[in-house]
């Protein structure tokens, strides 16, 4: 079938793509490898974000809690090599050798393999280890294929339903994996990078793609005709949030200035009007789709929209408009904040521009800086911002521990590189340490809620809202369902519609 019209053989998908490489250990590129149906991990997440078997059929923690043993299914890599305990061991060791982020997730001691089992020993007890191994960073690859295949350009040899035929940032062509352990619904798939949301919607309307991921709020109405389109839409487990740089010398180092900034912003209106009710307005650090007392935390949330109080807080912090230009100043310097954003997601520029307009009303100047997604990570780790917005998964291991640590646990000499903000709170760190060793789910939940309370009471972060997420497909396709977990787009569940 030609790639320009619908065919039973070829699935055509329109996506956003930030990856210019398919090396799963580089940056966050493993996400695309998994989203494209090429890579799989030991563990998969169900619709409530609970770990379930994938390459591993079962797992068990040792009585001393210092190791976990995984039993590996008898399956093959796409090149026909068997997925053995030893192959899994080498793949995880490769991730640790190449990705500093792995070490930040859990402290590996060593790994042993025996037949179809792998035992992972950690330097301290890790309650969420199975979930962590569901992260795309830990896609299981055939390390013996390195050198024969360029993982960067051709993708890794893994176990997913599809293999990479050709890859560029703009377009990826996939073929069915001949060694997949189940039926692969399509012979081919074409993934088109269409970063502009309205262009993505247009491609779906015109029938240039069969499936599109994350259609913008303003375009959803175009796909209401159920005879032509199926809309799969759910509450995501994401936050759109701005990290706030609280480093010494930065204006936001003062908690009163942080509170004033947050209280100057009418998030209800942004989510209801600008984003046409496809977002729940922000507050607590974790979204309402997760079971962490969202309602209780919302009730006690201190920085609700209150521009008059925001002005008062700025005055208390010594910021006054002495020269009548509408911007408050202190020691001869205006209160001017750099807001870094990228345009790959429709809502980010909207939130950035709305922030600029509302903050100005209380005397805060916001300078908007639009950057490419690929430089965002570096800007974040170096702390080169006052506000840095992103659309972020709050559970990266079926549990929010990694997320809560990544941005707000104290970064001691590079111990937590993702926290470039300078945020450091001893009570928060103590709870984080306690959480790391807690295996009881009810107690974990309590600790996490306490951590959230500290974040909101110290105005540590600005959560704009919690997005819904969607996948829309044409009538040529069946079972194109979006999952709460954002790693699964092209799966073996998406099939041609039976006519």
Give the ranges of each region predicted by the language model:
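Detector for C-terminal structural segments
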Residues: 265-296, 347-356, 380-499
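Structural transition elements
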Residues: 281-322, 343-350
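Ligand/substrate-recognition segments at binding pockets and active sites
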Residues: 320-395, 469
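Ligand-site clamp/hinge motif
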Residues: 177-222, 353, 365-367, 372-373
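Gly/Pro-rich hinge or "lid" segments in bacterial periplasmic/extracellular proteins
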Residues: 50, 134-184, 188, 307-308, ...
């Amino acid at each position: 079938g030609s790639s320009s019209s619908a065919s039973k053989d070829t699935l055509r998908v329109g996506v956003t793509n930030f990856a210019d490489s398919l090396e799963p250990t580089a940056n966050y590129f493993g996400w695309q490898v998994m989203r494209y149906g090429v890579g799989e991990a030991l563990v998969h997440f169900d619709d409530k974000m609970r770990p379930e078997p994938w390459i591993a059929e079962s797992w068990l923690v040792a009585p001393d809690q210092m190791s976990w043993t995984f039993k590996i299914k008898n399956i093959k890599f796409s090149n026909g090599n068997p997925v053995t305990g030893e192959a899994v061991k080498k793949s995880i060791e490769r991730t640790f050798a190449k990705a500093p982020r792995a070490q930040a997730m859990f402290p590996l001691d060593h790994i042993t393999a025996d037949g179809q089992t792998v035992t992972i020993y950690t330097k301290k007890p890790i309650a969420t280890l199975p979930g962590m191994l569901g992260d795309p960073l830990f896609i299981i690859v055939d390390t013996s294929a390195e050198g024969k295949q360029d993982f960067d350009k051709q993708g890794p040899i893994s176990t997913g339903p599809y293999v990479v035929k050709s890859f560029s940032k703009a377009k990826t062509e996939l073929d069915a994996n001949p060694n997949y352990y189940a039926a692969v619904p399509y012979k081919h798939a074409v993934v088109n990078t269409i970063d502009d949301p309205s262009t993505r919607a247009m491609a779906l309307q015109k029938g240039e793609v069969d499936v599109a991921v994350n259609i913008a709020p303003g375009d959803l109405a175009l796909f209401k005709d159920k005879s032509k389109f199926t809309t799969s839409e759910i509450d995501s487990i994401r936050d759109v949030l701005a990290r706030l740089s609280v480093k010494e010398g930065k204006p936001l180092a003062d908690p009163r200035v942080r509170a004033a900034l947050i209280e100057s912003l009418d998030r209800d209106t942004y989510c209801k009007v600008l984003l046409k009710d496809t977002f729940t307005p922000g507050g607590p650090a974790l979204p309402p789709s997760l079971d962490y007392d969202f309602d209780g935390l919302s009730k006690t949330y201190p920085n609700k929209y209150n521009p008059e109080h925001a002005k008062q807080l700025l005055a208390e912090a010594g910021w006054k408009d002495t020269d009548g230009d509408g911007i408050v100043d202190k020691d001869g310097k205006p209160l001017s904040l750099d807001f870094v954003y990228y345009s790959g997601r429709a809502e980010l520029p909207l939130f950035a521009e709305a922030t600029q307009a509302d903050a100005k009303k209380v005397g805060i100047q916001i300078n908007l800086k639009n950057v490419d997604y690929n430089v965002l990570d570096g800007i974040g780790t170096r702390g080169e911002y006052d506000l840095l917005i992103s659309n972020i998964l709050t559970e990266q291991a079926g549990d929010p521990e990694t997320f809560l640590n990544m941005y707000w646990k104290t970064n001691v000499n590079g111990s937590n590189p993702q926290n470039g903000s300078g945020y450091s709170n001893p009570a928060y760190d103590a709870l984080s340490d306690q959480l790391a060793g807690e295996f009881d789910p009810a107690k974990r939940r309590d600790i996490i809620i306490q951590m959230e309370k500290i974040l909101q009471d110290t105005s540590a972060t600005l959560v704009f809202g919690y997005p819904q997420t969607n996948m829309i497909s044409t009538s040529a396709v069946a079972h194109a369902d979006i999952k709460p977990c954002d790693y699964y787009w092209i799966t073996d569940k998406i099939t041609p519609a039976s006519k």
